[in-house]
From Swiss-Prot:
<dbReference type="InterPro" id="IPR005761">
    <property type="entry name" value="UDP-N-AcMur-Glu-dNH2Pim_ligase"/>
</dbReference>
<comment type="pathway">
    <text>Cell wall biogenesis; peptidoglycan biosynthesis.</text>
</comment>
<comment type="function">
    <text>Catalyzes the addition of meso-diaminopimelic acid to the nucleotide precursor UDP-N-acetylmuramoyl-L-alanyl-D-glutamate (UMAG) in the biosynthesis of bacterial cell-wall peptidoglycan.</text>
</comment>
<dbReference type="Pfam" id="PF08245">
    <property type="entry name" value="Mur_ligase_M"/>
</dbReference>
<feature type="binding site">
    <location>
        <position position="191"/>
    </location>
    <ligand>
        <name>UDP-N-acetyl-alpha-D-muramoyl-L-alanyl-D-glutamate</name>
    </ligand>
</feature>
<feature type="short sequence motif" description="Meso-diaminopimelate recognition motif">
    <location>
        <begin position="416"/>
        <end position="419"/>
    </location>
</feature>
<feature type="binding site">
    <location>
        <position position="467"/>
    </location>
    <ligand>
        <name>meso-2,6-diaminopimelate</name>
    </ligand>
</feature>
<feature type="binding site">
    <location>
        <position position="193"/>
    </location>
    <ligand>
        <name>UDP-N-acetyl-alpha-D-muramoyl-L-alanyl-D-glutamate</name>
    </ligand>
</feature>
<feature type="modified residue" description="N6-carboxylysine">
    <location>
        <position position="225"/>
    </location>
</feature>
<dbReference type="GO" id="GO:0008360">
    <property type="term" value="P:regulation of cell shape"/>
</dbReference>
<protein>
    <recommendedName>
        <fullName>UDP-N-acetylmuramoyl-L-alanyl-D-glutamate--2,6-diaminopimelate ligase</fullName>
        <ecNumber>6.3.2.13</ecNumber>
    </recommendedName>
</protein>
<dbReference type="InterPro" id="IPR013221">
    <property type="entry name" value="Mur_ligase_cen"/>
</dbReference>
<dbReference type="GO" id="GO:0008765">
    <property type="term" value="F:UDP-N-acetylmuramoylalanyl-D-glutamate-2,6-diaminopimelate ligase activity"/>
</dbReference>
<dbReference type="GO" id="GO:0071555">
    <property type="term" value="P:cell wall organization"/>
</dbReference>
<keyword id="KW-0573">Peptidoglycan synthesis</keyword>
<dbReference type="InterPro" id="IPR036565">
    <property type="entry name" value="Mur-like_cat_sf"/>
</dbReference>
<dbReference type="InterPro" id="IPR036615">
    <property type="entry name" value="Mur_ligase_C_dom_sf"/>
</dbReference>
Amino acid sequence: MNKICLKYLLLPWIKNIPKKYISNLKMDSRTLTPGDLFIAVPGIKKDGRHFIVQAINKKAAAILCETKKKDKHGIFKYIKNVILIYFFKLSENVSLLANRFYKEPGKRLKIIGITGTNGKTTVTQLINQWSTILGTKTATMGTLGNGFYNSLQPTNNTTSSPIFIQLFLSKVLEKQAELVTMEVSSHGLIQHRVKEVPFYIAIFTNLTQDHLDYHENLEKYESAKWLLFSTHKVKKIILNADDQYGKIWLKKLLNFYTVAVTIQNRKQKKYSTKWINATNIEQNNNSIYITFESSWGTGRISSCLIGRFNVTNLLLSLACLLELGYSLSDLIHTSEKIIPVQGRMELFSYVKKPTFIIDYAHTPDALKKTLNAIHSHYQRYIWCIFGCGGERDQKKRPIMGAIAEKMSDKVIITNDNPRNEKEKKIIQDILNGCKNKEKILIIPDRKKAISYAYFGAKYHHIILIAGKGHEEKQIIQNRSINYSDKKIVLNLLGKNI
């Protein structure tokens, strides 16, 4: 990459900086190379300002250091020939700096931002998949990875760092991407990671209890999600208007371009610019058929995705693609080509073997909707295997225990990612929500729990494995070990095929 002048980069904020050229922007001192600009800001776990000495020793070209004092903004000094510049509210401006450094890549792309408690990954991947089928070069950023369809690179965060986001947009633009779908987490919004991303469309899936370990309460969590629609650059907004928050937000956004997405609920369309409403849903074992009416016309799409929540996910994706200018006829005719998203209601069904369903459901609402979907499609004996993550929202644990007990025939409580929390404490928290202990088994080892269910189930039974979905690691204490629900399931089924 060509070097950029630090004086030019900082011009919108600081005027008197000496001419100096930098190669890259870095927030992690471990990845620094000579000539980089080190951006030292406080984080949740570590403070980048504590690593300034390492940055100097690694021959950073310059250092930007966050200061809480407004009068220190723009002051600079030299330490071992490295310029250190104080920057007021630097954390809030990293996205803007990165956007300027990478020459505003978002302006030459159509970027779709998807937020919500559940469904972000599915909608992100559906739009990616559907648009790719129709010939568009679409890149994606999110939980399943970053990149183009079928070539995603693993990622640690749902929403990446503000620097990486702009770098990614720059790289996919070089590879002739036209469209980018991006999961936008509440953490990413509060931490200003997408502040300078020009979203063409923002989509809201739903809002239910999650991340209360971080946000403290549902009101603060709602406020975080609302930031995407209230303070960010968005041209069009698509809302799940069946969701209680979606309904409220639709009325708050009367002066904006909105699309209301509903199931058998025409009342919300009077508050929106455009709308789409499912009028009839037909379900069988492995398929769903959705008849709809909309501002673009009427039609019927078919899909192998199951569950009422996936009707909403499909309609949100359909509305987005219609707003992007795709033809309704083309979308209807290609809907049946869409395949399930990895780790989201992912089905493994073989003759005379129990049917496995792997799903990422890790919130009370998601678990309830997943079990509802299984009931409506299969009407069979259901095993539910799940746990809850350690060092995360503890309030949801008994609620999820109650849901699993009520909606399943047999429940196995196991480990999810216990992290540094005691597994017995997590399991007991879940058990506190359960009344009928006779239908519940405790098998902390997740692999053993899945094996027990497989060998104990009859061929017509359904075994739901909830919570980890696509994940290929399990975090126990400070160790991240190789682990995959899917690999265990395929191994079990393969032994007897």
